[in-house]
Design a protein with these regions (language model features):
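Rossmann-like AdoMet
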Residues: 1-71, 75-120, 124-125
């Protein structure tokens, strides 16, 4: 009889197992993938997030350092469009530290290619 495993461990194994994990060896996002996300459909979603970020930064009193972290960035399209959208807000962009938390080596490659001109750091945990 097999032991039960906690749900979080099952999900982690199903998505990120080094050999058979759903996100590890392929890109499941987009026209040839299994699903599509809002940033792939239209740039407007990311532009709205960018506008909100600028407004939030202003409400915070324009801090010199603002960490912006995207969790599971897929193809990296949203981070790309956010950086493009804020390019005219120089003071805001200079205050931002951009991070992408990603576990999938395949998706990291895609994200880095898409965001090659943007100053982004990739992380594998929030600690």
């Amino acid at each position: 009889m097999e032991k039960a495993i906690p749900l979080d461990k099952f999900i982690e194994h199903s998505l990120y197992d080094k050999k058979r994990g759903y996100y590890i060896n392929k890109n499941p996002i987009g026209e040839n993938g299994d699903f599509i996300t809002s940033p792939q459909i239209s740039v407007h979603f990311s532009e709205m997030i960018a506008i909100w970020l600028v407004g939030f930064w202003e409400k915070l009193g324009k801090p010199k350092n603002l960490n912006i972290i995207e969790l599971g960035a897929g193809t990296g399209e949203m981070m790309y469009q956010i950086n493009k959208s804020i390019s005219s807000f120089k003071q805001f962009k200079q205050s931002c530290n951009f991070y992408i938390l990603e576990i999938s080596p395949e998706l990291i490659k895609i994200q880095k290619k898409r965001n090659s001109l943007n100053k982004i750091r990739w992380i594998d945990n929030l600690n």
